[in-house]
Amino acid sequence: MILITSLAVLVSYLIGSIPAAAWVARRRGVDIRKVGSGNSGATNVLRSLGKGPALLVAAFDILKGAIAVGLARALGLDPAWTALCGVAAVLGHNFSPFLGFRGGKGVATSFGTMLALDPVVGGGAFVVGVGCIWLTRFVSAGSILGALTAVTLAAALARPGWLLLIVAFLAALLTWQHRDNIRRLQAGNERRLGEKKD
C-alpha cells in the first residue's frame, strides 16, 4: 500500500504539473510567460488571449485537482492521503517541471481539490470568491477571500482535523503566491479585471 500511495502522490503531482495555460497560449503563438503578468494561469490567459482560452484553462486546472482526488479515492487511499494527492496536484501546478519549476498561483487547482474533497466547503469558498471578484473586479482579492472562506467553513462545520489542515495549507500557499498582488492592493495599484495595462 505504501508503494501505491507514493505512486498516487507522484502521479497527482504530474497531473497538476500539466501546463494548460502555456499549451493553450502556445497554440495561439504566444509564450504566456512573456506576456501580461508572466503568470501561467487563467487570469493571465484572460488578459492576454481572451475569454474562450481562459475558460478552457480554468476548467482544465480545476479538473487537475478533482482528478487527483478522484484517482486517490479509486485506489482506496484513506481520506488524509486522498487530500494530500490534491495538494500534490496544486504543487505540481505551481512548480511545474515542464516550466522550469514555475507555474501558476494554484487558484483553480486548489478550488478543484477543495470541491472534490468537500463540496460544501469547496462550493462555499468558490461562491464567495467569485462573488468578491464580481463585486470588486480584483481576481487576487477574490481568490484569497475564497480560500480563507474554505478554512472558516471547515472549522465552523467541524470537519475532520486532516481536512482543516489541508484547506489551511492550501489557503496559506495561495495567499503566499499572491504576495505581490497583496502589495499592489495595499499600494492601490492592483489591476482590476478588464482594466487595460498602462
Swiss-Prot record:
Belongs to the PlsY family. This is Glycerol-3-phosphate acyltransferase. Its EC number is 2.3.1.275. It is a multi-pass membrane protein. It holds the Pfam family G3P_acyltransf. It is found in: Cell membrane. GO terms for biological process: phospholipid biosynthetic process. The keyword Nucleotide-binding does not apply. It catalyses: an acyl phosphate + sn-glycerol 3-phosphate = a 1-acyl-sn-glycero-3-phosphate + phosphate. It is an enzyme of class 2 (transferase). It comes from the Bacteria. The chain crosses the membrane at residues 1-21, 52-72, 81-101, 115-135, 153-173. GO terms for molecular function: acyl-phosphate glycerol-3-phosphate acyltransferase activity. Probably interacts with PlsX. GO terms for cellular component: plasma membrane. InterPro entries: G3P_acylTferase_PlsY (IPR003811). The keyword Hydrolase does not apply. Catalyzes the transfer of an acyl group from acyl-phosphate (acyl-PO(4)) to glycerol-3-phosphate (G3P) to form lysophosphatidic acid (LPA). This enzyme utilizes acyl-phosphate as fatty acyl donor, but not acyl-CoA or acyl-ACP. Keywords: Cell membrane, Lipid biosynthesis, Lipid metabolism, Membrane, Phospholipid biosynthesis, Phospholipid metabolism, Transferase, Transmembrane, Transmembrane helix. Pathway: Lipid metabolism; phospholipid metabolism.
